[in-house]
Amino acid sequence: MSLDEKMILLATCFLFLPYQIASVGIACILVQAFCRHKLVDAIKNQTGAIFLYGFIGLEFIVTILYSNWNGFGNTWLFVLIGFYGAYYRKSITKNTFEKMCDLIIILSIFAAIYGLYQFNQISIANGRSFLEFHIFNSPKRRITSTFMNANIYAMVIDFVCVMCMYRFVKNDNILCKIGYVIVALFNFFVLYLTGSRTALLPFALIFPIFLYCVRWKKLFLTSIVLELCVCGLVFLKPTLIPRMSDMSTFASRIKIWKTAFICISMYPLFGWGPQTYKKFYPLVHGHKAPHAHNIYIDSILSYGVIGTILVLCYTFVLNKEIFTSNTRKENPALFGMMMCFIAIVLIYGLLDCTLNIVATGTLCFIILNSACMYKEK
């Protein structure tokens, strides 16, 4: 295993640490790559680089012009993820990719154990016992593991569950297959305890999508029937979903979106850069929030029409690589995992913005860039 491959695995470990440590750790890996003359060429050959770094450059200019210093800092995160994505593309191999997925699955176990510890502490502090499994509505009283908040951790779990499906297909060892199922179920249990309702929505699609991509037709049809049964059960008994009776957060989102549209109407072309909502809402006495809680609205709000077009151009180029590479033919399970990641982001994005953090942003970015392993040379 080369040094670059070892650095990829080290960076993977950093993703499960608090975001401050993760950011510094990945930055150090990029510095060593630059010193070894590995980074510049990687960026030059990065798919869609002109759109990605054109967008980042635009956001630096916009955030400075509007003194949006939170957004300025957030833009440096885009640089970090973009540069690491370039280094990843240059360094990743098929064998290292499988090891990386297994490492993520193993690390998720420790994150989940810590999440259970948090849940126990929160329960005791609020006069409850662990076995009551009472999930509070307050974000401060919900488990986050090593991540910023419950919803970000929940998205990480969504990604991990998809990886468990991927490795279940790729690994022929029966004991390993059983292990992946156990880890996925354990993570799903902890996901339930996060109280993130949004994170449960993708499960209505990711199983059929993945099974269709790996061409398991009978299981694909079975999964659709089971999904419909689960949806019917939830319809008949909504209390199965945690915090389902609390609609205050959805009412808050309506207020947030109304405030966001006011800002969009005033600054439609460029916005104010990342986290525009956080800077704008006090000016119109809007509902307090760090972002617009919808990636579609937040994209137009923060980046404007011009910035959003650049993001869409990059997304188009990256998806073109995914669909024109040999990924679907040579590794349908990886193609299925990519489609599931896209589905998770699109569904999750209806009610939240959870990609603007190093763990979720980097993890999603590198998986969607993994088709580079199957490009025709």
Regions found by a protein language model. Give the residues of each.
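Alpha-helical transmembrane segments of multi-pass inner-membrane proteins
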Residues: 98-131, 135-138, 145-214, 235, ...
